[in-house]
């Protein structure tokens, strides 16, 4: 009797994991297609930190590649920054176990940061710049055409509010960008993925997670406050997070105040410039009492063998 109960439980867990994986595959596949992140013949360098996000990114990309209508290569790269207590064996052992090409880059950025930054000050800014430079260099050495990072939808929304609250900018994380020197293209294939989905997936797949607090730096309190704010909104107002993410995909420049984005000076009597969307000078916009975008992913049953649509390069 107990064996039957365990069997049914295992079946349910397997079914739920299958649904979750297909949802993540669909979201990643859609992001890749919408922003033309990966093209035929690309060599994608997946930056692997040992956290849940980068593990999930690598796993889903490897899974998608099996049925993709284009060919692309994947190489995983980890930057060992020589932080005290960093378990150097975990990532090589894991990457060997899944038979993926990989490179471990050892650079003592930890020592440099500790030398340059006074005790008690945040080290994140300098550490980030050093890490970025090393990863760009490594991509060039490996012949990688794309650099894939594990930032997800929640990261992008948090960054949007951080820039509004503390930077005075309407700016988020782009799903795809080019480096200042024009030599590297960075992509974020998890852009449409929810953090809670990634957390569940990482637990179910039993990824060997490496703690993210080894450097001993102060936590980013501003980001944590914004994260908690968004989580509270998500609990109190279901659908609000999805609507906000939809908003950063539907920008109306003529109804903001950035004269660099929209030329307000060319507005003249008798002429309607392109890009203006509706006259609401005296009218208040009417909104639905509930968010227009509702997340239905939890209710979706995916078709077995579902194909993900990539944009193939001619």
Curated annotation (Swiss-Prot):
Q: Where is this motif: PP-loop motif?
A: 49-54
Q: Which reaction does it catalyse?
A: cytidine(32) in tRNA + S-sulfanyl-L-cysteinyl-[cysteine desulfurase] + AH2 + ATP = 2-thiocytidine(32) in tRNA + L-cysteinyl-[cysteine desulfurase] + A + AMP + diphosphate + H(+)
Instruction: Provide the E.C. number(s) assigned to this enzyme.
Output: 2.8.1.-
The record ties this protein, via InterPro entries, to:
Rossmann-like_a/b/a_fold, TilS/TtcA_N, tRNA_Cyd_32_2_STrfase, tRNA_thiolation_TtcA_Ctu1
Kindly list the positions annotated as binding [4Fe-4S] cluster.
124, 127, 215
The task this protein performs is described as: Catalyzes the ATP-dependent 2-thiolation of cytidine in position 32 of tRNA, to form 2-thiocytidine (s(2)C32). The sulfur atoms are provided by the cysteine/cysteine desulfurase (IscS) system.
The UniProt similarity line reads:
Belongs to the TtcA family.
Recorded protein name is: tRNA-cytidine(32) 2-sulfurtransferase
Cofactor binding annotation: Binds 1 [4Fe-4S] cluster per subunit. The cluster is chelated by three Cys residues, the fourth Fe has a free coordination site that may bind a sulfur atom transferred from the persulfide of IscS.
**One term of GO molecular function:** tRNA binding
Q: Which gene encodes it?
A: ttcA
What's one Pfam family the UniProt record gives for this protein? ATP_bind_3
Q: Which domain of life is it from?
A: Bacteria
Q: What class of enzyme is it?
A: transferase
Assembly, in brief, is: Homodimer.
Other notes: The thiolation reaction likely consists of two steps: a first activation step by ATP to form an adenylated intermediate of the target base of tRNA, and a second nucleophilic substitution step of the sulfur (S) atom supplied by the hydrosulfide attached to the Fe-S cluster.
The biological pathway it contributes to is:
tRNA modification
Swiss-Prot/TrEMBL GO biological process terms: tRNA thio-modification
* Cofactor(s) it depends on: Mg(2+); [4Fe-4S] cluster
């Amino acid at each position: 009797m107990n064996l039957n109960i365990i069997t049914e439980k295992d079946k349910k867990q397997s079914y739920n994991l299958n649904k979750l994986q297909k949802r993540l595959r669909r979201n990643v596949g859609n992001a890749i297609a919408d922003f033309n992140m990966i093209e035929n013949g690309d060599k994608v360098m997946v930056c692997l930190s040992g956290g849940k996000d980068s593990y999930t990114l690598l796993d889903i990309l490897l899974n998608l590649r099996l049925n993709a209508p284009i060919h692309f290569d994947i190489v995983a790269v980890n930057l060992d920054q020589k932080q005290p207590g960093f378990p150097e064996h975990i990532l090589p052992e894991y990457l060997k176990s899944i038979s993926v090409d990989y490179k471990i880059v050892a650079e003592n950025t930890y020592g440099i940061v500790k030398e340059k930054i006074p005790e008690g000050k945040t080290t994140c800014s300098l550490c980030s710049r050093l890490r970025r430079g090393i990863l760009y260099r490594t991509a060039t050495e490996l012949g990688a055409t794309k650099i894939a990072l594990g930032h997800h939808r929640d990261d992008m929304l948090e960054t949007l509010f951080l820039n509004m609250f503390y930077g005075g900018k309407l700016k988020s994380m782009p799903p795809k960008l080019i480096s200042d020197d024009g030599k590297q293209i960075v992509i974020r294939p998890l852009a449409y993925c929810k953090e809670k989905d990634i957390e569940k997936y990482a637990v179910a797949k039993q990824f060997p997670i490496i703690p993210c607090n080894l450097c001993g730096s102060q936590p980013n309190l501003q980001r944590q406050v914004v994260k908690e704010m968004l989580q509270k909104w998500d609990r109190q107002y279901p659908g609000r997070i999805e609507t906000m993410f939809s908003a950063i995909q539907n920008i109306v420049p003529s109804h903001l105040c950035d004269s660099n984005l929209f030329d307000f000076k060319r507005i003249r009597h008798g002429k309607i410039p392109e890009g203006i969307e509706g006259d609401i000078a005296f009218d208040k916009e009417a909104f639905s009492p509930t968010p227009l975008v509702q997340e239905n992913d939890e209710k979706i049953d995916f078709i077995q063998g579902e194909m993900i649509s990539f944009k193939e390069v001619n």
